[in-house]
Amino acid sequence: MPRTTRRRLMVATAVITAATAAVAVTSAAGAFDSAQQAKNAIRSGKAKNVILLIGDGMGDSEITLARDYTVGANGRLNMDKFPLTGAYTTYAVHADGTPDYVTDSAASGTGWATGVKTVNGRISKTPGTDKAVKTILELAQKNGYATGSVTTSELTDATPAVLASHVTDRSCQGPADMAKCSTDTIAAGGPGSIAEQSVNHKVDVLIGGGKQRFDQTVTDGKYKGMTVTQQAQKLGYQVVTDSAGLKSAKSGKPVLGLLASGNVPVEWTGKAAAVGGTDPQRCVTSNPNRPATTPSLADSATKAIQLLEAKQKAAHSKQGFFLQIEGASIDKQDHAADPCGQIGETAAFDKAVKVARAYAAKHPDTLVVTTADHGHTSQIVPLEATPPGLSSTLVTDEGQQLKVNYSTNTPGLSQEHTGTEVRIAAQGPQAYRVLGVTNQTDLFTTIREALRLR
């Protein structure tokens, strides 16, 4: 064991010993009992499975806003209940390797997917030389693990894309979107668009939005003239589009779930923030524009776990699975300064966290990590404040008013990411590695070591 790893494990042991003692006291007062989780968290052995949960744009302000509104200031979300919590830095780099202090989702995702920092907009390629870098999903496949990706964005959006594609620019989502990726086209000898690469990689489970990208026609190569969806079917994929189809999907063949033309519709709605603020409002927790046949993120995550586990059992494999689950529209609603949409997506993501933790409770050889790719714009401010930008006043489940402000860009423009560090929390084998302040690229190492990927 390397000296730095041994030292971190010793520190983790001391922290957990103290935490376990504290839990023993607080449990009697009704607090959740995480003593056994705490003991398991310092395990340095191999994990059979890894479930990585990404709340896109879910900084501490976004978590606090969702907590305050849904469970109260003194309540706890599922993501608050992990035994080990740290923080990691999120910066990207310029082509020369110097820091770019505010990342986008492509560069941040590349960081944990490959262990390499890159420039904003690039998907799993180096910053200066634009060379493809092996991803954690590709390594997991090579080592015999089942793999999956579940998201509420288009499957070709940046965060899911970093796992199984390599393109110069994140906009190159389908065969018709390759203007910024001339060297990545199949005609130029490249691997093609993000959609084409995703199915060519034979990822076992792909569930999200983005049907419009997969409906585009392949322009070159073996599948020329087909849509990417038809290409996927040629490669053996079961293609499903709603809850019923997802429920009936079998584990014998890979699954491509295309649940929406674009991003999956959000769960909640309400008035967007406005210059000068809004009247106090309660969020509408059932979006009338979300089809009733659309599975929740938690339902999609549950099915993905079932499919991946069943595949490995049928193959009598000693290896388990790697699964990434993304709550993508926390970020998208932050960009739109829509607090109700944002809170609803955070709450939906938190239910997926509950699914992952419930699975890990029955399978303690599962490493579960939850984190964000970057911080975002929303801030809880005093009710009497008159901040610049866009504001909204909400009435929480506790019956209190809460003012949220968005001021990282001019009103009318998309609100911007922030360069802050973000939370990372974990349980299971190798979870101690998240303690302290780490780098986003360290998450790649944590997963690689947990699964013993070589």
Segments (PLM) and residue ranges:
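Mid-sequence acidic-hydrophobic segments that form the walls
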Residues: 115, 139, 143, 209, ...
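Secondary-structure transition into beta-strands, especially the periplasmic turns and strand N-termini
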Residues: 144-146, 363
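A short, compositionally biased domain-edge/stem linker segment
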Residues: 32-42
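A post-motif C-terminal structural segment
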Residues: 44-49, 58-63, 68-110, 156-454
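Active-site-adjacent structural elements in enzyme catalytic domains
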Residues: 48-62, 67, 128-144, 154
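Noncatalytic scaffold domains of N-terminal-nucleophile
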Residues: 92-128, 134, 138, 147-152, ...
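Secretory targeting and sorting signals
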Residues: 1-31
